Amino acid sequence: MAKAAVRKPKKKVCVFCKDKVDYIDFKDTSLLRKYISDRGKIRARRVSGNCSQHQRDVATAVKNSREMALLPYTASAR
């Protein structure tokens, strides 16, 4: 049996770098919901495709948004 050709995964481009965003607002919950899982956890950098600086900014914005009760800390267990 021949091995299937292994494809290189396409590098994800940071959306914030591409759009030249300098500030991620914690009040923009529709944007931040893209970066949290259905269980309420912050998605990893390799999953979201953010650069390290913007991943830190997203994490800080999500944490601030949780503190202000705009986003949940966790989803309901069952």
From Swiss-Prot:
One Pfam entry name: Ribosomal_S18
PROSITE patterns noted in UniProt: RIBOSOMAL_S18 (PS00057)
Domain of life: Bacteria
Signal sequence coordinates: none
Keywords: Ribonucleoprotein, Ribosomal protein, RNA-binding, rRNA-binding
GO biological process, one term: translation
GO molecular function: small ribosomal subunit rRNA binding; structural constituent of ribosome
A GO CC annotation given for this chain: cytosolic small ribosomal subunit
InterPro entries recorded: Ribosomal_bS18 (IPR001648), Ribosomal_bS18_CS (IPR018275), Ribosomal_bS18_sf (IPR036870)
Family: Belongs to the bacterial ribosomal protein bS18 family.
Function of the molecule: Binds as a heterodimer with protein bS6 to the central domain of the 16S rRNA, where it helps stabilize the platform of the 30S subunit.
Quaternary context: Part of the 30S ribosomal subunit. Forms a tight heterodimer with protein bS6.
NCBIfam families, sorted: S18
Protein name, entry field: Small ribosomal subunit protein bS18
Native organism: Frankia casuarinae (strain DSM 45818 / CECT 9043 / HFP020203 / CcI3)
Organism phylogeny: Bacteria, Bacillati, Actinomycetota, Actinomycetes, Frankiales
Gene name of this polypeptide: rpsR
